[in-house]
Amino acid sequence: MADELDVVDIEGDECDEIVGDLSSAEILQDQYLQSAWRTNSSVLPWTLDSSISDENRQVIESMLLEEQYYFASKKAPKVAWTNEKTKVKKPLVKSSAAQTRWAEEEKELFEKGLAQFGRRWTKIAKLIGTRTVLQVKSYAKQYFKNKPKAEPAAEVTSANVTSVSSIQPHVSALTNAVRIERLSDDEDVDITDDFSDSELQSKKQPERSVSPDCNHHGELRPSLSDALLHLPSESTAADGQADPDFSEDTEIHHSEIDSEAVEESGNPFINLDSPSKHSLTGEEETELADKCESAECLEEEVEDQEEDEEEELRAPEQEVELDLNTITEEEKQAISEFFEGRPSKTPERYLKIRNYILDQWRRSKPKYLNKTSVRPGLKNCGDVNCIGRIHTYLELIGAINFNCDQAIYNRPRLVDRSRLKESKDSLEAYHLAQRLQSMRTRKRRIRDVWGNWCDAKDLEGQTYEHLSAEELAIRREEMKKKGPRPSKLPKQRGSFDPFQLIPCKTFGEERQEPYSVIVCAEALIVMDIHAHVSMGEVIGLLGGTYEEEDKVLKICSAEPCNSLSTGLQCEMDPVSQTQASEVLGVKGLSVVGWYHSHPAFDPNPSLRDIDTQAKYQSYFSRGGAPFIGMIVSPYNPSNSSPQSQSTCLLVQEEPGPSGSHKFPYQFNMQCSAEPPDWSEVMRRAEWVVFKYRLCHGSVPMDRLFRRDSSLTCLEKMLLSIRTVLERLSEVDIETFLVQLESLFNTHFLSETGSSSTHLYETATQPQLLSFLSSEPISSSATEETSDGHDEPNTTGPDKLEQSCVEEEHDETVMQSTSAETV
């Protein structure tokens, strides 16, 4: 019995089925065939005649082997013909097709991975484990190519199923289409060829031919091979009747196979009585293989043409109106980066960018809206690339730049041919998203005859003038006489000097003083001493109180600060700022202003001073507190008086034809008759002396401050301070001035190489202080002279809260100059 055999031969015997009733014609005899040749479709009956000579036998054998290799792509068997009837067990050797055959488990994993990962072949290959990425892609290509063919085949009418199942021998033929026998676990099953056994053909009944799909690889289509593998194993080759336990599903599978075979063969009924009508000769096999290959090539070409046609995107026929409050599904697919849960790219941000671009298009319509024009209004909304992609998407769908000549709808893109063929809307959105990955193709720009850039279309239809060398030279001379072409570089603004001095305006009837300013003598003395000792600008803070009801600002104290040089300007040292603020806070005073010096020019603010003052005012006005600025000019050449010049100012904005401008306004400040705290004044004077005595930018206090004066800088400073203290008692004034002069003579002049003898020589042979001009000292000169401590300054209010460092003090000097001696 066939069901008791130990060998499974499911390749089928093609020659048995094709030959038909050859056994009855006494042409095909088993003793002439060995099992190795039984599966060869190219073996014909006449090749087995024993009367053929050995020489002809070898020629025919070689021809058959070559023909077999060409059509079946199998290794030719090396078994020779013999008249002995030997039953040899067919060795189960894997062919090239068998090596790529997929098991059911692998197919299930492939479908599972396809549903989970899509067309990510690398992940699917990792999921399967036994297949490479190339094998997965190759199988997927056949899978998707045959899938649409298998689905229509399943739609078989019930009438056809009934008519097919009603024929008893037909079921038996299908059950024997593949010989199912018991196998051991370690044996392979080759399902390359599936044909019915020759034992069934002796019944001489008209049946439909069961043939596999044409494939130049020699493999079955997955759906057909699956159907054959699901046939019941109880069927045998010798059994001519249908299995009573045959299920309805199996019949449906059979009908699918038959219907597909009928469609491909074109002849639903084949008479097995005439072998010449249904047997495949070599020419027919060649023709059949050529048809299969040409059909597959044609199908691939059609698919390629379809994909190429899909790449072309037509221009929108009408303008699209988008709802400003909703986001469509097409937008989510095309601009998916904003809908992936990223914290920096949210749907709200996409809506903001899209609506802004749409709004700009409505304003500029019908003028073309480019990407550059929308970027300034979308700051902090993402990188320019994502804004550009949204712009391109809106242009492609016709939401913006509709009917504009500059709009470009067909852009080059990378075609992903492995993508699933989804619905029309999804496919269009996918193509649209692919186009967004490529940048806009720029129009070609060329130079005209004058060398200027222009569009290539502008030069169309022009005739070029061919000039000789002499004419060209004359033309160039004429162009030179006309003058050079204006430069296309952006025009520079008018010369902007940050150190340009701006005269202060005065308050009057049109603009009254916002409050009155009273300055105590203590603050004026400290500012005057600090400004006299340095050739560069010095800087400090002002402390005082503000009476809101009376609108009176009283400046009670001045705290000198260090300065930091940045090459072009100097700023207040944040450490020293913080220290000065804390000292004023301990006294119960608030920071109500700042001061700096103009050593050798007018006490008018520069453009940079105005900007700094405006920043301070903006910072301190948040709490409702006023903030003023003071400028002290000790060595102004235009001032012949020994008294230093000072200005108290405030910056206010005024509207103008080109916008609002900031102008400085000068207060009419009043001096307070309140006596200063002498100990605090001497403390700050000591800080100034020990700070600047070794600085390169310190003023030599023993030199004359003017050519037409006999006063030294120290004497000039003492006279200026005396003028401030003229309302106080003479005793207090003299005591303080003697103490101050002693401090400078002992610790300032001695450290700079001065002595009493030198002072005497200075009086007899005066040396002038080297202030070159009335303009501000340049930054380079300031760095060279003041060692980076005193320069033109600007200070930011944001640095008032940093830490501070105290200067070193000489304890013996502090004791000798204490307030007790005064």
Curated annotation (Swiss-Prot):
Listed InterPro entries: Homeodomain-like_sf, JAMM/MPN+_dom, JAMM_MPN+_peptidase_M67A, MPN, Myb_dom, SANT/Myb, SANT_dom, SWIRM
Motif (JAMM motif): 596-609
Keyword tags: Activator, Chromatin regulator, DNA-binding, Hydrolase, Metal-binding, Metalloprotease, Nucleus, Protease, Transcription, Transcription regulation, Ubl conjugation pathway, Zinc
Residues at which Zn(2+) binds: H596, H598, D609
One MF term in the entry's GO annotations: metal-dependent deubiquitinase activity
Ranges of biased composition (kind: Polar residues): 813-822
Listed Pfam families: JAB, Myb_DNA-binding, SWIRM
Task performed by this protein: Metalloprotease that specifically deubiquitinates monoubiquitinated histone H2A, a specific tag for epigenetic transcriptional repression, thereby acting as a coactivator. Preferentially deubiquitinates monoubiquitinated H2A in hyperacetylated nucleosomes. Deubiquitination of histone H2A leads to facilitate the phosphorylation and dissociation of histone H1 from the nucleosome. Acts as a coactivator by participating in the initiation and elongation steps of androgen receptor (AR)-induced gene activation.
Family per record: Belongs to the peptidase M67A family. MYSM1 subfamily.
Name assigned to this protein: Histone H2A deubiquitinase MYSM1
Biological source species: Danio rerio
